């Protein structure tokens, strides 16, 4: 997968894709319906498969002081999208200029002149442009004028509750301490990724060596103790381990930072 961050300067091989558009926070099963639709169209047309995301997340831009809510920071999102077969991941910076851009301008500058899209796929509730003025009906009309196709996927409901798959519902499950319910909606276990911090090493003295990760970018789930599987991706101890994790204030030594502290078996 190729990561593309300068949409206004695309080489020819990065244009003309079938592009799924969204924030895709969590890359959950509802998102996968959009991505699978795009993949099928890309195969039929013989075009590259792309995804267009926005960084920072628009909510982070408009509410910078709000509690952290991200299910998947960009590196994790890119990993998941790559596993789903995305060829081109377009990352458009969300800033004051983009927030103030009319929907018509978004279509002209980004979709047509920037990406040169062949076809786009969005969810039924997709909104864009200044004050969220653009909706899927507007997008379909503009696509007809500009010569690109538009597909709109309907809501995908969960089998258990009948509710639509949504990042908001997954966040609620995690904040209420229901990781298994969250995993059912994600289609995979929720994952926290980050560098292991150098601690005070006192865990070794009581027989429980730990790996500590600061939770700076992602949602803070309900504090408590969880059974986990941990992967160390580099170093002499690289591998996959079972473990027990505490999420919250470091209870052993009365630290005040919110941490993910994993005891590895």
Specify the residue positions occupied by each region the protein language model found.
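Short acidic-hydrophobic, aromatic-tinged amphipathic segments that line or gate anion-handling sites
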Residues: 2-9, 69-72, 90
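Classical nucleotidyltransferase
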Residues: 97-209
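A glycine-rich helix N-cap at a beta->alpha junction
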Residues: 73-90
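Glycine-rich, highly charged phosphate/nucleotide-binding loops
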Residues: 69-77, 101-107
